[in-house]
Amino acid sequence: MKFLQTSLIAAALPAALVSGRFVIENEGDNVQLDEPAKYLIELSPGETQWVTEEDKWDLRRNGQNFMDITDTQELGTLRAWTQSQASVAFPDKCVKQKEVGELAGHLTKDGMRRNLEKLTSFHTRYYKSDYGRQSSEWVLERINGIIKDAGAEDTVTAEHFGHSWPQSSVIARIPGKTNTTVIIGAHQDSINLWLPSILGAPGADDDGSGTVTIMEVFHTLLKAKDVVGGSAPNTVEFHWYSAEEGGLLGSQAIFQSYEKEGRDVKAMLQQDMTGFVQGTEDAGKPESVGVITDFVHPGLTAFIKKVIEEYCSIPWVETKCGYACSDHASASKAGYPSAFVIESAFENSDQHIHGTDDLIKYLSFDHMLEHAKMTLGLVYELAYHDFSSKAVEEPSEL
């Protein structure tokens, strides 16, 4: 997740440390030993520029969202085919109250807390670090443990989606009767924007909270024997993306692959930052969840509002976060309907992120439970929804 943050830390850090460049003194002149690598980023649809890694972190520290498209320039090029997916018919109302209500009773705050305590115990989950590799290994191990405990090994799978950097993404798949797919996502990486390779980044809220929220939903959904047994019409996937903080790198790689394969993805929901309510309370506003309304699919977003009204005990508020603010943007660029729900109105969200102070102590597990209820309701409703009916929707704002 990307936010506008200002800090005096930058002024206190030597430029060589922030940039990672090394120089030598030669008769008063600084001589740079190596030309830094360049990356192609997209700041808004069609607006691109080449930057160094130092430039990337400078942009992030100044609140600028972007997609690093250096290795994913083909993402979205097949949208002439996938644009037909924009005309997806979402339900008019929720119809699985009995089943979702029974399952929701199995969602626990304790489970999310235990998983988040483990996830934040890694010094950082920076995608280029060995800690990031280790944390992604733990995520896959935990998901496989959930599958085994549910006795679902014969039908449900989990695997790494490898990248050119150490940290892998993780994909869990619950097959349905068709390959029509509903995806729930979160990003597992964290970052310290000042010295990513050195300083700690516990990433409790960004996005440890989303990671363990959808992990808890996955755990609970496997208690539905009909879903595990393949009775649902649609396939369900849970994604834990690597390298969101580097410019949506992991999710872009996955959705570029899905686009090339012609995968039939009808809906993708991103859960990025689900635990901070203090900002809302300090603003004198009622606790709520923030439904993102820009650069998302309007039909899916409208149905998510209905899901929140049906299954959550707190209301929704509309809010905006800009272009490429989280991994749902990768799905949208591939032509797949996507949406994003965050912990609050954007202006009241967590400001402790991207440093050493993104800690569990600032989070509300009661609030995370509301996100879990919403996610469970959405995924169960859509797992059983007949997407074969036709409807004309407004296209995503891309």
UniProtKB/Swiss-Prot annotation:
What this protein needs as a cofactor is: Zn(2+)
Q: Which GO terms describe its molecular function?
A: aminopeptidase activity; metal ion binding; metalloexopeptidase activity
Pfam families in the cross-refs: Peptidase_M28
GO BP field: proteolysis
| Species, as recorded | Trichoderma harzianum (Hypocrea lixii)
Q: Does the keyword Disulfide bond apply?
A: yes
Q: How does it assemble?
A: Monomer.
Record protein name field: Leucine aminopeptidase 1
The record's comment on protein family reads:
Belongs to the peptidase M28 family. M28E subfamily.
